[in-house]
């Protein structure tokens, strides 16, 4: 059975990645990219609509954004919250619940999938500022949280 995970690293420039996973197999990275604010909703809406039309289950994983003393000082801080709101609205527009959004800590994603691990597993996005790589990390973390074991990391 096929399932999709759409993973998002929200911000002024956002990373978005779409994965497909068949039972018993490793996730397949279908595409990844980095998007500015005026481009952000389009790939999300397209991925959600295609999943609905094909009748494939889709989960959404997104980097959690927490406001603290440091983020208050950061001029870019509202962008992440705004992008998460847009993501939730895209979900609602196709009949999903905003509560179905799987928010994940950035530290968890980076700890489990640092750059060398992404390269070893061949989930690498070339170019950009690293936002697509962060989205890829969140997609893979979602699969780990739902039972996938990245055994490729154990190989020498």
State what each model feature region is.
Residues 1-156:
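Phosphate- and other anionic-substrate recognition elements at nucleic-acid/protein interfaces
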């Amino acid at each position: 059975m096929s399932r999709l995970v759409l993973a998002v690293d929200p911000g002024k420039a956002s990373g978005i990645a779409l994965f497909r996973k068949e039972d018993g197999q490793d996730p397949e990275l279908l595409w990844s990219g980095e998007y500015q604010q005026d481009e952000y909703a389009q790939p999300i809406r397209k991925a959600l609509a295609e999943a609905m039309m094909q009748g494939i289950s889709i989960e959404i994983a997104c980097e959690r954004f927490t406001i603290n003393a440091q983020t208050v000082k950061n001029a870019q801080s509202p962008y992440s919250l705004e992008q998460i709101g847009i993501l939730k609205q895209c979900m609602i527009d196709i009949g999903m619940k905003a509560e179905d959004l799987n928010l994940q800590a950035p530290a968890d994603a980076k700890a489990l999938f640092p750059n060398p691990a992404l390269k070893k597993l061949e989930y690498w996005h070339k170019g950009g500022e690293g936002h697509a790589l962060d989205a890829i990390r969140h997609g893979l973390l979602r699969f780990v949280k739902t039972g996938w074991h990245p055994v490729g990391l154990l190989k020498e």
